[in-house]
Amino acid sequence: MLKCVMSGSQVKVFGKAVQALSRISDEFWLDPSKKGLALRCVNSSRSAYGCVLFSPVFFQHYQWSALVKMSENELDTTLHLKCKLGMKSILPIFRCLNSLERNIEKCRIFTRSDKCKVVIQFFYRHGIKRTHNICFQESQPLQVIFDKNVCTNTLMIQPRLLADAIVLFTSSQEEVTLAVTPLNFCLKSSNEESMDLSNAVHSEMFVGSDEFDFFQIGMDTEITFCFKELKGILTFSEATHAPISIYFDFPGKPLALSIDDMLVEANFILATLADEQSRASSPQSLCLSQKRKRSDLIEKKAGKNVTGQALECISKKAAPRRLYPKETLTNISALENCGSPAMKRVDGDVSEVSESSVSNTEEVPGSLCLRKFSCMFFGAVSSDQQEHFNHPFDSLARASDSEEDMNNVCCRKEFNGSDAKYFCII
């Protein structure tokens, strides 16, 4: 159950959050908890995630409670609100925010779980009331698993400075490249798009390190990501008047755009384009190279004992196995140092995995796809599981080769001897 009341100025901030999330996905989740009301969304390709958390003190009145259902074995079962709304149904309600801020005295939002409806009521001056009944779909919200605090590069800048910079880019711009050094910050058009002769405009914007509230660069980095999500969080940050924090590592690793405020907290996690140079120098690539060296050594030793014909027969009949097989706990802990995360699911199971969150995107001879985004997979989580974590947005889910997770992405399987490598192409 959810009940909350907002004033006119608070409705404007809430509407800006809805508009920012609409740049990511066509649907979003209402996820109330004792920490506040969270709005979450994930795009269809699982390469972008957005979450805005409104603390209880943001609202004039905030009430949330979980339903308790008695089971046959006399054990209480806590049922949390599973509410997924279509963006097309709720976005027109918060379209004219300036008019709503001037004319609305208060806004009331509550849920009717028995009828699967979210009710939004606007109370205008002179006793006028407008009510919207929106049907929702019962669906478990998703939460990304990504620890932004361990990123090598961290920036903090006022949103107005960054908003003035993106004015230089055209409306048709799909991707931008962020290049940083210990002294400079450069935001420019994507290199791939600049090669297109139909797009004659190439923009670059340089900002000195003294213009930032916080500027920490651990290594020179150049990453490429989608431009649409950046514009969305900039619009929202201008409404909250809070600085934007940017966390990132090398290409292929996710980029985090965050707003931390006493009343509102926002996190946008974006996938970045991976290149050959970054994959060769990444910790995952080091692990893969060591793995290949060991497999090559085993094959050389095996070649001394069996004939080439026997090897060919074995390679044809050998069943494909995962790139990282089940190993001892010491091997798993060693791979965790290479950036292996965990994935949370709805039943509360948290499984350790030995694969990196960045998918293996090695070049395939003859492949027509030259640009690859690292794909992010997500596990469904319930509100009660958030209590086991220090932060609601602290980690990014791993890439999985399970049959269920592979339905939303286009995957190729490459066999090399007895090893099977999975990689996602977006």
UniProtKB/Swiss-Prot annotation:
Gene Ontology CC annotations of this record: checkpoint clamp complex; nucleoplasm; nucleus
Key words, A-Z: Phosphoprotein
The keyword Phosphoprotein is assigned to this record: yes
Gene Ontology biological process: cellular response to ionizing radiation; DNA repair; DNA replication checkpoint signaling; mitotic intra-S DNA damage checkpoint signaling
CDD domains assigned: PCNA
Phosphoserine modifications at: 359
Parts forming coiled coils: none
Tissues expressing this chain: Expressed in testis and skeletal muscle.
Domain of life assignment: Eukaryota
Record carries keyword Phosphoprotein: yes
Subunit structure: Interacts with HUS1, HUS1B, RAD1, RAD9A and RAD17.
Family, similarity comment: Belongs to the rad9 family.
Protein name in UniProt: Cell cycle checkpoint control protein RAD9B
Organism: Homo sapiens (Human)
Gene name, Swiss-Prot/TrEMBL: RAD9B
